Amino acid sequence: MNRPAIAKFRGAGIGGLSLAFTLGALPLLADTPAVTVTAPRELEQLRNEVDTFVSSAITRPYGDDSLLRWDHPVCPLVAGMPRGAGEFALLRLSQIARSAHVPLGSETCRPNLFVIVAQNPERFLRLWWRHDPRLFNTRFGVAPVKRFIEYSRPVRVWYNAAVTGGDNGVVLGNLLATSTDPGGGLVDYPVFAGPSILGSRITRTVVQSISSAIVVVDLAQVSKLNIGQLVDYIGLVGLAEINLDKDVGEAPTILKVFSATSIPPPPEMTVWDKALLQSLYTTPQRNRMQLSQMETATLKLLAAR
């Protein structure tokens, strides 16, 4: 088994919990051509579409908080998939992360990106939470956690984050928590940020960094996807805080695989998705204009193709 350096695969369980879920209903990834932007577009039209896509797809932070991303090595663990599908998922997630310049952990890293396929996600999450009461971190009690557990969607995501120095140094705050469910929002712990030479009107003293993420797939709701579509979708929502309830406009994106439209969804992550991720990880997180810089960077990447 040729595993990527960061890869960890578990087909049996997580934290002592048994998993008996399979992905037998998912077809394998077919050989499909890459999705590219081929229709001629005027630059201004492309800019408008890119701005809509980036500003809608990326979850806007509260107040003066930075955008959320992985600033420390990500280490995925996959559970609930057959071995072949699990190995494919880990390899593909590694490829997505590398191409977007996401830091990756070593072969012996401790898992912090949990990808779980479950037949009954709500029941599994309740059992896992009971087994590990510190699994979710939130300042305002258990309400955000319950929303995350109880709200049904094909793929749900929970991010635990830490506040770090603007140079990605020492952790300054306890864990934060945010989920993609309606009303989940960012729930933060109070953090003291004293005077710093890093802070200014255009730069932040501290930034938010994902410390762990939980991606839970409802097997019954993804049966129409092939394994490639599913893993690419997981890669995007697991590496960036995506707003799953916003309309991203006309952009061709893997985020539309669950949209109820007559237009066939992309067979894999598109160049728009790749540009979005790359722009998130190549623009300065401390800069208060990062979202605008992401729009510019994404436009340049797409226009160059």
Regions found by a protein language model. Name each.
Residues 28-31:
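Boundary at the C-terminal end of the N-terminal hydrophobic targeting segment
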Residues 44-70:
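Compositionally biased P/S/T/G-rich terminal and signal peptide-adjacent segments
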Residues 53-62, 95-102, 200:
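N-terminal post-signal-peptidase region of extra-cytosolic proteins
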Residues 47, 77-92, 101-305:
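Long, folded non-catalytic interaction modules
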Residues 1-11:
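N-terminal secretory signal peptides that target proteins for export/translocation
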Residues 34-35, 66-81:
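Acidic/histidine-rich, surface-exposed loop or edge segments in extracytoplasmic proteins
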Residues 33-43:
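N-terminal secretion/transport leader regions
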Residues 15-25:
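Bacterial N-terminal signal peptides
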